[in-house]
UniProtKB/Swiss-Prot annotation:
Its main location: cytoplasm. One of its GO terms (biological process) is purine ribonucleoside salvage. Pathway: Purine metabolism; AMP biosynthesis via salvage pathway; AMP from adenine: step 1/1. Catalyzes a salvage reaction resulting in the formation of AMP, that is energically less costly than de novo synthesis. It is an enzyme of class 2 (transferase). The lineage of its organism: Bacteria, Pseudomonadati, Pseudomonadota, Alphaproteobacteria, Hyphomicrobiales. It catalyses: AMP + diphosphate = 5-phospho-alpha-D-ribose 1-diphosphate + adenine. This is Adenine phosphoribosyltransferase. Belongs to the purine/pyrimidine phosphoribosyltransferase family. Its EC number is 2.4.2.7.
Length: 181
């Protein structure tokens, strides 16, 4: 993607200082989602590396990963798999606990969400430390998926999440980087 388009995408993301706590700059993609041109360019850029290839499913992490992942799945003519917080899926699930900055959380996926060997792309809005994304990759692999790549609109490279996924042999595709937290 050309640098001007990437710059425009970055400009479409609102930065909110000291949210949710002092010292954190929250990267708010709702402004990008609300701009039809920016939203389309972001989805097109997330789809680009996989166009023409076989992607069976796109998995999105709750909640913004649902918005982006659904759009990516549509463009790739793939199915969509939601990865949700524990207790939100109605059928038989597989769950995983993962570490947060303060404490732990759990996410889950339907146990039959993919067929063994399905080629899956994981999508979310942002990668920071990589804890949530790593848990999602682990869940997908646990139910038999081949995780082809993980895609994010935003990377916070100082926090090392993308590197953590690459160490698991998961290629990472991001659109824009922001410094800091």
């Amino acid at each position: 993607m050309d640098p001007r388009t990437l710059s425009a995408l970055k400009d479409a993301i609102r930065s909110i200082p000291d949210y949710p706590k002092p010292g954190i700059v929250f990267r708010d993609i709702t402004t990008l989602l609300g701009d039809p041109g920016a939203f389309r360019r972001a989805v097109d850029a997330l789809v680009h590396p996989f166009a023409g290839g076989r992607i069976d499913q796109v998995a999105g992490i709750e909640a913004r990963g649902f918005i982006l992942g659904g759009a990516v799945a549509h463009q790739l003519s793939s199915g969509f798999v939601p990865i949700r917080k524990k207790g939100k899926l109605p059928h038989t699930t597989v769950s995983i606990a993962y570490a947060l900055e303060y404490g732990t959380d759990e996410m889950e996926i339907h146990s039959d969400a993919v067929k063994p060997g399905d080629r899956v792309v994981l999508v979310d809005d942002l990668i920071a430390t990589g804890g949530t994304a790593k848990a999602a990759v682990d869940l997908l692999r646990q139910i038999g998926a081949e995780v082809v790549a993980a895609c994010f609109v935003i990377d916070l490279p100082e926090l090392g999440g993308a590197a953590k996924l690459r160490a698991l042999d998961v290629p990472v595709w991001t659109l824009v980087e922001f410094e800091g937290h």
